[in-house]
Each structure stands twice: as structure tokens, then as C-alpha cells.
């Protein structure tokens, strides 16, 4: 009888299961004995590459030895127990490949252990003049080309530790993983997509998106908060999900044809435009059994390499600390200029990209889709000088705190972006349909955590610093829509505990929030919000910790509950003055609360709020423009708060206060203004009240430079990089040669320079900003050696 294809498939599956489930017991502290070792450089598929001509077999421990360069040129379902790369293992760029493996470890030395988390306490030193061990699944200058696939499939072996294996671990080696470049990995819709449509139009052509690719079309809806509910399917209390997955069947310029009609409408005009993101890449790292034991990847201190245009799917170990799809673990600045570019990370059981104890990384153009716990995550509050630019975060789900996590106060409750040290740059990112927060900056002091940490300052010196006093390096042009609770939340519940100062406030610029419950909650002291557009939300600026707060160019469109809340916590007692300049209300129709909530008493005498350039269009409320809200009210009248509206008439200022704080005789001229003041507020013209300047930001922070690449071209060295600053970049030099700035937005500048090679291969890149601040920690780097 001739075997049927189905019968053959069953036999193959059984054989693979036997290979993966049997074998030697795991002892992570004991050096492994290799079954197959390289004898010299060559192709993986050739017997002459291996000791004794014995090629690797299913279940083997395999070693690519120091000094050997091996090309991986097979597409094999034989699952290897471990591959130790002490030389160079480079994947073919000419044919598709598959490596099925339990542990892939890049580490110098002739011996290693089967540990999927820790490296040697002291990594073996390279011999003098030795080449760093390298796993190359493409390189930045020579990625795996379109049309060729490279897949790493991480498989768990019976008897190995399910908390640490399977894994890819870089222990002082170089791990490069680079797929075919894409001009954009996600884009906004250029026109609305209706339910039933099979075609969507993007804002620009996507010639490098291909048929068969998996895409998501993000939600344009808001489900609103619901205690205990999640966008995660089978969560017990699942909320309706608006984001839809489809496959591409045709690409015509900016128009995609999808394999199935859309079930929901997706917005595509004005402020409210949904995103379409491509999840597919030609280089893939995945778990062999997503429903079983999943894999993870790690870069350790002293490693090198980076990731671009690769797909990390079905990874991350649920509820296990440190086992994430992409994890930079206590790297500090030993991988400066590295990072993750254009990757997709989806169906993760534990975050997307984790930056832990690491500085000077670039995470750009990445797509994160479905994560248990926070998605793009900076772990321990010491991370600084990192750039997160133009990433998309969709569906970070509520999880639980991880065992022994560094910051015990973090509930891990589903933020697209989560960080605890302000000295990082976040620009052009979008968060959508995350369970609790689009963006959550959270830092607090607790019995289990002291925020005074040893961190490196701009001068290069490391010293104790209360990280609650470190303002945002740059937070600009970010957007949130459809998130379960907050678009943006900053700071801590404790009044004034997270604080800048008058010259160094926390600054957020040009934020956009739509289809949101709470748009923004700023619980920081000394705060500047310069540009906010909110459309279709219940609450605008919610529970602000007013104390030296400055709001400029704020627009509320169809905010229906509380556009401006009276203050922090239920007492709504401001701690200090605040100002609003150029404040617009459009289409805000409120049933109960006013457009601007006021409060009776502050925590100290003399506190005032100042408003200028207020515009009200097609908006109304039963509570008027200015009044008390409908929530709990304090009866305290000590430390009365004044609200001044400037330029309400030609050169006039109107003071508004609560009725309970006004003396009937002294304030006899105070009266209600029809359509302006509500039932419990009164107003009168006052003189000699100037609009205050509460903040005077000073740019005395040097910029930071990330060298992201160096390549040889016509005998010259072409060096490229990114510099970022809280102001604007003026110049970048490499070894004294001026670089050309090719793009600049929101304090982030891309640059390139061509120069002669140096005799010793050493280079120094330095940036100066427009305020004249010179970088004191320039990026010093050495041209990598060739294998």
C-alpha cells in the first residue's frame, strides 16, 4: 500500500515529538557535551564542515567553534537540542531556511551551559585579536532579501526548564536579525473603511507589502471602562474588540485588497483615523508550540547586534519574570546605538519589547499586537536616553504583577507604553485598544521601593538621584485612541511627589486623544502641556495635580462629561497655580457638569487659575461654562481658589469664585452671568491682574547620540545615526567631520556622514543642540572586525 500524505505527516509529527520530548536531562549549571562540532568553515549541509563528517541530527547539542564561519543553508524540521555559536553562523541569503532548536546561544569559548537565562558569571574572554561570536540572520547592510525566508523555531524539550527554555540568548556575542526593509510598517487610513469593505486605502503606497501578508486594521470605537473586563478573548469578561485581522490578497499602490470583508467600520478622516499595520516579515522567530511552552530571547551585557524588519510571534512566557519576546537585559550602554527597527511582535504572553537596565537604544517603527501585560516596557526606572519613535501598540492586556518584579507597585495592568524614568524620548507613537492605558508614566515611592537610584547624569557621572525629579527628555506627537481607561497618565497619586521645577518642568507636546474615556491624567508638579486635541471622549484633563501647571493650545471636541476636572482626588484641592492659554470647546454638550470645573479651596492660600483665549462653539451645559462639578464636594472655604478669565472684554479680567467663598458685603458686585457661570459660581470684573508666567523652561540638557550603523562604500566609511534632545539638534560630528542631518522631527534627528577610515578603527560621534549644549558623553565606537 502506498502511504497517503496524511499518514506521512502523522509519522513525521510523531518523530518530531519523540526528538523534542526525549533526550538528556537538563543541568543548566553543567557544561554540555556536544554531539556535533564544526571542523572548519563551510556550509551547514556539507559533511566536510563537521568533525568526523557527522552532520547535526535531531536532538543534538551542536557547536560552531571559534574561528569557523558556517552558512546555515537548510530548511530542517529536525529539532536540535542546542546550538552554541562560538564562531559565526550566518543564514543563507539565497535560499529559505528553518532552524528548529531548543536553545540558541551566542557566547565565546569552547564550553557553555544549557541555561536559557543566565550567561557565565564572567563570560569567557576573546583571544587577542579574536572575532566576536556572531549569529547573523541577515545584517543591517545585507539583510535577508525579500522572497527568501529565514525562520527560527524555538522548541521545548522534555526535561529542560520550562521557565527558561526554549530561548535565543546573546551572552557577549553578536546577534543580528534583519529582514527585508520596509518603507513603512504601519500607516493611517487615507479614507474611511466601511463594514463590508474588502479594500482599504492607506496614506501612502506600500510597494514592499506583499500578498499573503497578515495585517490588522485598528479600532475606531470606544468600549469604555468596565471593572475586570479585558479586550483579551477568553478572559472571563471579554469586551467587544474593534481591531480586525486580515490577509492581503492584492496590493495596488496605497490600496490593499483583503481576504474577507471587514465586520466593522474604521475611521479614516480628520483627527480620527485608524491604522493598518503589517505583521508579516520574511525573517521570523517563533515558538514551535504556542499553546504549550513558549520561547523568549535576550541580549545580555556586552552583547552586540540588533533587530530590523523581523517578526517575533507566539513568544513570551506568561507570568514569568524576564522571559519576553525581545529583552535587553541589564545591558546599560554596552549596546549603545542598537535596538529594534521595523519589527512586529504579536501574540505575546509577556510584553513586546523590554528595555531593562539599558540606555541609548532606538526602538522605531515597530508594531506590537496582543501582549499579556504592558507592551513596550522600560523595566526598573534606571533606563535613560532611549528613543521610542513611531511605534504602534495595540491590545496590551491586563495581566498580574510578575514574581519578584523590580517595581512592585506596578500592577502590570495593560499599558501600550509603560516607563518609570522620564529621561527618555517618546515621539510619534500611537496606542490603541489597550486594556487600561495608552501611555503610562508611573513612578512612586513605596515601602518596597526607594526611587533614589544610582543613575548616570548628563556629565557621565553616576550618583544617587531621585528619579521622580527627572522630567521627560522628549514626549511629543503621541496619540491614543480606543484604550480601555486612559489615553495618557503621568506621575503618582501622592501630591507633588513627582516633580520637575520651574526651569525644568515635565513637558508634553502635541498630543492627540480620540474615542477615549479619560484623555489625560497629569499627576506631576511643574507641568507644561503644549498642544492637546481631544475628540469623542468622556473626560478631558482628569484629576490634574494643579501646581505650576501650564496648558496651551487645548482643544476639546465632543467631550461629554468633564472636559476640565477641578483637581486631583475627590477633594479637588489644587496645590498651586495653573494657567490655560488658547482653550477651545467645540460640540461639547454636557448634561450635568460645566465645561470648566472649579473648586472651593486649595491646600494653601492664594492659589489661582488663569484662563486666556477661551473659545466656545456649539457647546453647552446645564452647569454653564464655569461651575462646580457634580461629584463629591468639599465644604471647606479656607484658602479660597480664584479663577481669572483674561480678555473677556476689551482689556478686562473676570474673576470667578464659589458662592460659599464670597462675603455678601465685600463681594456685593459678584453676580451670575447667564450662559457662563453655573448655579454655585459668581463673577465680577477685577483690575490689575496679569496673566502669570508660571514656568520658564531652560534648555541646559546636552543631547544624546546613537550611532546606528557603519558601512564601507568605495573605500570610505559611511556612518549613520540618530541624535535626540529636549530642544533641537544643531550639529553632529564624527571624528570632527560634520554630518548631514537627513530628517528632524520633535527633537529627533537622523544623520549620515562619509569619512575616511581610521587607522585604529575608532570613531567618536558628538552632538550639539541649538541652545549650545555640547554632549558630554559622546558615542565612542569601534568598527567591527570581519569574521
Predicted regions and their residues:
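Acidic Gly/Asp/Thr-rich repetitive segments characteristic of extracellular carbohydrate-active
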Residues: 34-66, 203-214
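Extracellular beta-helix/beta-solenoid repeat scaffolds
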Residues: 59-188, 207-208, 216-225, 232-250, ...
Amino acid at each position: 500500500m502506498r502511504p497517503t500524505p496524511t499518514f506521512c505527516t502523522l509519522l513525521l509529527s510523531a518523530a518530531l515529538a519523540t526528538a523534542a520530548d526525549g533526550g538528556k536531562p537538563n543541568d543548566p549549571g553543567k557544561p554540555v557535551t556536544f554531539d556535533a562540532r564544526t571542523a572548519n568553515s563551510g556550509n551547514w549541509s556539507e559533511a566536510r564542515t563537521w568533525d568526523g563528517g557527522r552532520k547535526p541530527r535531531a536532538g543534538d547539542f551542536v557547536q560552531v567553534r571559534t574561528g569557523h564561519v558556517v552558512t546555515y543553508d537548510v530548511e530542517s524540521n529536525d529539532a536540535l537540542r542546542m546550538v552554541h555559536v562560538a564562531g559565526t553562523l550566518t543564514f543563507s541569503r539565497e535560499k529559505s531556511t528553518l532552524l528548529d532548536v531548543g536553545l540558541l546561544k551566542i557566547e565565546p569559548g569552547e564550553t557553555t551551559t544549557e541555561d536559557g537565562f543566565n550567561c557565565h558569571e564572567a563570560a569567557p574572554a576573546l583571544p587577542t585579536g579574536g572575532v566576536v561570536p556572531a549569529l547573523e540572520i541577515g545584517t543591517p547592510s545585507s539583510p535577508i532579501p525579500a522572497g527568501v525566508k529565514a525562520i527560527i523555531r524555538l522548541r521545548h524539550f522534555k526535561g529542560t526548564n520550562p521557565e527558561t527554555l526554549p530561548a535565543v540568548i546573546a551572552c557577549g556575542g553578536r546577534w543580528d536579525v534583519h529582514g527585508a526593509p520596509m518603507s513603512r510598517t504601519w500607516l493611517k487610513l487615507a479614507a474611511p473603511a466601511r463594514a463590508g469593505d474588502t479594500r482599504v486605502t492607506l496614506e501612502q503606497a506600500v510597494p514592499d507589502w506583499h500578498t499573503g501578508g497578515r495585517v490588522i486594521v485598528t479600532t475606531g470605537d470606544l468600549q469604555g471602562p468596565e471593572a475586570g473586563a479585558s479586550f483579551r478573548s477568553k478572559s472571563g469578561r471579554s469586551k467587544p474588540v474593534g481591531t480586525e485581522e486580515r490577509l492581503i490578497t492584492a496590493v495596488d499602490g496605497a490600496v490593499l485588497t483583503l481576504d474577507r470583508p471587514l465586520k466593522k467600520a474604521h475611521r479614516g478622516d480628520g483627527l480620527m483615523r485608524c491604522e493598518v499595520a503589517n505583521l508579516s516579515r520574511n525573517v521570523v522567530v517563533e515558538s514551535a508550540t504556542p499553546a504549550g511552552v513558549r520561547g523568549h530571547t535576550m541580549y545580555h551585557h556586552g552583547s552586540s547586534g540588533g533587530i530590523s524588519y523581523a517578526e517575533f510571534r507566539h513568544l513570551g512566557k506568561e507570568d514569568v519574570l524576564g522571559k519576553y519576546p525581545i529583552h535587553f537585559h541589564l545591558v546599560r550602554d554596552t549596546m549603545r546605538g542598537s535596538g529594534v527597527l521595523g519589527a512586529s511582535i504579536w501574540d505575546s504572553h509577556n510584553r513586546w519589547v523590554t528595555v531593562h537596565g539599558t540606555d541609548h537604544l532606538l526602538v522605531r517603527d515597530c508594531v506590537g499586537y496582543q501582549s499579556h501585560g504592558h507592551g513596550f516596557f522600560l523595566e526598573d526606572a534606571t533606563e535613560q536616553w532611549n528613543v521610542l519613535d513611531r511605534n504602534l501598540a495595540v491590545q496590551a492586556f491586563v495581566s498580574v504583577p510578575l514574581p519578584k518584579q523590580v517595581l512592585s507597585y506596578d500592577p502590570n495592568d495593560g499599558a501600550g507604553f509603560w516607563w518609570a524614568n522620564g529621561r527618555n524620548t517618546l515621539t510619534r507613537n500611537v496606542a490603541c485598544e489597550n486594556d487600561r492605558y495608552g501611555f503610562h508614566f508611573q513612578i512612586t515611592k513605596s515601602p518596597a521601593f526607594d526611587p533614589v537610584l544610582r543613575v548616570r547624569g548628563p556629565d557621565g557621572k553616576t550618583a544617587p538621584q531621585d528619579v521622580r525629579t527627572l522630567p521627560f527628555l522628549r514626549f511629543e506627537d503621541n496619540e491614543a485612541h480606543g484604550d480601555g481607561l486612559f489615553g495618557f497618565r503621568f506621575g503618582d497619586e501622592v501630591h507633588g511627589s513627582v516633580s520637575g521645577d520651574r526651569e525644568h518642568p515635565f513637558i508634553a507636546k502635541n498630543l492627540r486623544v480620540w474615542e477615549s474615556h479619560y484623555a489625560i491624567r497629569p499627576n506631576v508638579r511643574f507641568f507644561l502641556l503644549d498642544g492637546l486635541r481631544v475628540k469623542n471622549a468622556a473626560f478631558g484633563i482628569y484629576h490634574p495635580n494643579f501646581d505650576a501647571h501650564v496648558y496651551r493650545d487645548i482643544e476639546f471636541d465632543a467631550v461629554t462629561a468633564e472636559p476640565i476636572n477641578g483637581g486631583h482626588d475627590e477633594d479637588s484641592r489644587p496645590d498651586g497655580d495653573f494657567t490655560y492659554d488658547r482653550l477651545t470647546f467645540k460640540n461639547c454638550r454636557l448634561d450635568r457638569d460645566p465645561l470648566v470645573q472649579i473648586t472651593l479651596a486649595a491646600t494653601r492660600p492664594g492659589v489661582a487659575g488663569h484662563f486666556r483665549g477661551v473659545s466656545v462653539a456649539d457647546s453647552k451645559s446645564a452647569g454653564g461654562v464655569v461651575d462646580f462639578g457634580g461629584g463629591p464636594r468639599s465644604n471647606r472655604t479656607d484658602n479660597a481658589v480664584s479663577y481669572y478669565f483674561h480678555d473677556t472684554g476689551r482689556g478686562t479680567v473676570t474673576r470667578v469664585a464659589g458662592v460659599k467663598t464670597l462675603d455678601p458685603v465685600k463681594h456685593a458686585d459678584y453676580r451670575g452671568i447667564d450662559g457662563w457661570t453655573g448655579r454655585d459660581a459668581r463673577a465680577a470684573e477685577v483690575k490689575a491682574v496679569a496673566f502669570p508666567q508660571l514656568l520658564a523652561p531652560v534648555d541646559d540638557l546636552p543631547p544624546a547620540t546613537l550611532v546606528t550603523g557603519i558601512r564601507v562604500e568605495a573605500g570610505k566609511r559611511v556612518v549613520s545615526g540618530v541624535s535626540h534632545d529636549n530642544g533641537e539638534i544643531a550639529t553632529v560630528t564624527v571624528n570632527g567631520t560634520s554630518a548631514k542631518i537627513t530628517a528632524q522631527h520633535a527633537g529627533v534627528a537622523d544623520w549620515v556622514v562619509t569619512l575616511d577610515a581610521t587607522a585604529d578603527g575608532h570613531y567618536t560621534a558628538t552632538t550639539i543642540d541649538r541652545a549650545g549644549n555640547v554632549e558630554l558623553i559622546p558615542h565612542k565606537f569601534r568598527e567591527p572586525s570581519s569574521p
